[in-house]
Curated annotation (Swiss-Prot):
This is 4-hydroxyproline 2-epimerase 2. It holds the Pfam family Pro_racemase. Coiled coil: none annotated. Signal peptide: none annotated. It comes from Rhizobium rhizogenes (strain K84 / ATCC BAA-868).
Length: 332
């Protein structure tokens, strides 16, 4: 049996976003949080086939479009990447919104705005359209907050590190320069991957954060290594790690949200403040704290992220059960 998937490929500030516009598995008409559980249980082979080699690669990410059960949303989305099926993905949302509008997949109820149901909740996206193309997008992300301060772990190759745990749609370990880590300068991509893997393993022993409003969202699977900006167009720089060995090419939407929540929790950003976050390749997301929020009684923020994406092609992908590598593979 051969299954086909119609995909539209894009990138958000350098990070790939593969939008599955046709062929995704049929799921019950329930919330996206419930659909995510069903997808992971029964259909994770789709994620692996579309994200892993030979059809994808180590940093591939994407989204599958679904109808929403919410009357206040235009559509719904599941976010998939090499590491799993995520509650939320900021870069993925920016790419998804750009594809949905430029390719005519969705007709928004309100021109200039899309409302999307995600497993993490409803997110709104404002977009600027010029000559039929989406020039810029601003994502209004889910409520974000600082979960834990100064979690001390021993990381082989560095020694003792103090990290914060923050939520921006996914839980992040937030690392700032300190005695045993001087910053991103001089770190290779291989260094970031190796140290992130060790950090995540060490954190898993001492810290297992759970979202206060949804216990299905738990655990630190992402890290953001933060440093001073590399250009005058940014306020900070970060390397986002996820999966087994992936480094986000964009500044990271949920990562930038988590970083702003951490800075807010430490009193270094306030309501209405902006934070321009630079990626390793020099692209920038403009974050802004739109308002305050309570997340299970914990003070947090309502972040927005400004960025852009570009459509790069159409792709009909076949998954043939006769193929011994039909469901993809990874080299670890």
């Amino acid at each position: 049996m051969r299954r086909s998937f119609f995909c539209i490929d894009s990138h958000t500030c350098g990070n790939p976003v593969r939008v599955v516009a046709g062929g995704g598995p049929l799921l019950p008409h329930v919330s996206m949080a419930e659909r995510r559980e069903i997808f992971v249980r029964d259909h994770d082979w789709v994620r692996k086939a579309l994200m892993f080699e030979p059809r994808g690669h180590d940093i591939m990410s994407g989204a599958i479009i679904y109808p929403s059960v919410r009357e206040d949303c235009d559509f719904a989305a599941l976010f998939i990447e090499v590491s799993g099926c995520l509650p939320m993905c900021g870069a993925g949302t920016i790419g998804l919104a750009t594809v949905a509008i430029e390719e005519g997949l969705i007709t928004p109820r309100v021109p200039g705005r899309l409302s999307i149901e995600t497993p993490a909740g409803k997110v709104d996206v404002d977009y600027q359209l010029k000559d039929g193309f989406v020039e810029a997008v601003r994502l209004f992300n889910v409520a974000s907050y600082l979960h834990s301060r100064d979690v001390v772990v021993d990381v082989s190759g560095l020694g003792s590190l103090s990290v914060d745990i923050a939520y921006g749609g996914n839980f992040y370990a937030v690392i700032e320069p300190q005695e045993n880590w001087s910053g991103l300068d001089g770190m290779s991509a291989s260094d970031i991957v190796t140290l992130s893997q060790r950090l995540r393993d060490a954190l898993s022993v001492v810290c297992d954060p759970v979202h206060p409003d949804d216990e299905r969202i738990r655990g630190v699977h992402h890290a953001i290594w933060c440093d001073a900006a590399g250009s005058e167009n940014a306020d900070g720089r970060g390397a986002v790690f996820y999966g087994d060995k992936a480094i986000d090419r964009s500044p990271g939407g949920t990562g930038t949200s988590a970083r702003m929540a951490q800075l807010y929790g430490r009193g270094r950003l306030g309501i209405g403040d902006s934070f321009r976050n630079e990626s390793l390749i020099g692209t920038v997301f403009e974050g802004r704290i739109e308002g305050a929020a309570l997340v299970g009684g914990i003070p947090g923020i309502l972040p927005s992220i400004g960025g852009w994406a570009r459509v790069i092609g159409h792709n009909t992908i076949f998954v043939d059960e006769r193929d011994p590598l039909a469901h993809g593979f990874q080299i670890r």
